[in-house]
Amino acid sequence: MKIVSSTSVMALVTAAMVISPSVTLAASHSKNLASDDFVGISFWLISMALVAATAFFFLETQRVSAKWKTSLTVSGLVTLVAAVHYFYMRDVWVETGATPTVYRYIDWLITVPLLMVEFYLILRAIGQASAGIFWRLMIGTLVMLVGGYAGEVGYIDVWPAFIIGMAGWAFILYEIFLGEAGKMSANHAPESVKSAFSTMRWIVTIGWAIYPLGYFYGYLASGDPAAAAETLNIIYNLADVLNKIAFGVIIWNVAVTESEATS
């Protein structure tokens, strides 16, 4: 029988300390969820799923070898940061009916770079990944997020902002498919890592394609503003739970597979 390591326990305690004030503050300032408030319900369900995923990833670090612990810990940090922000976003939505744009982009400015770090870490675990891979992924991420934020808060027109954001995303896709990161995975990774890297790439391709749909329905399509806000938040919420938790599960799977193969 395996005993939960003190490191895993400490990680869980730290996560609980981070999440608890957010839950308490959100609960003390919010109204009850209406039975027909599907956006608010989605915020709550996803925040709970993110908390559960955080506990899972932190506990599972004890099952993997040392070179995979950082990757799995980063997966837990992604879901932890997202969970905290989702409690606040839910509170904003339930109280005001407004889109919690600022909280959402603060979340993305932390979690999306961490997701890109996962590509770098998984390559570093199987060889010498260059710093250039890391910085190119960071640059693409920041261009994508800054463009989207500028359009959503009205700093620039929504169409130019959309194009800037899409350009950042395209730059990321180039790096992980055709750039140095993609070539390193194809030429040097074992089959389990290669499969995980490929799945992660398709999440960034297909899973991230959900976000432009939310932006389009929220800001570029004509129609009722209230309905547009609901559609935008539902789409963003579904995209977040898919991309952040699924990403972590892929990392967990390859970490456990590789660790057991070498043990």
Regions inferred by a protein language model and the residue ranges of each:
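N-terminal secretory/membrane targeting signals
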Residues: M1-A26
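Polytopic alpha-helical membrane-helix bundles and their juxtamembrane interface segments
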Residues: S22-R104, Y120-S263
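Ordered, amphipathic secondary-structure segments that act as subunit-interaction surfaces
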Residues: L114-E118
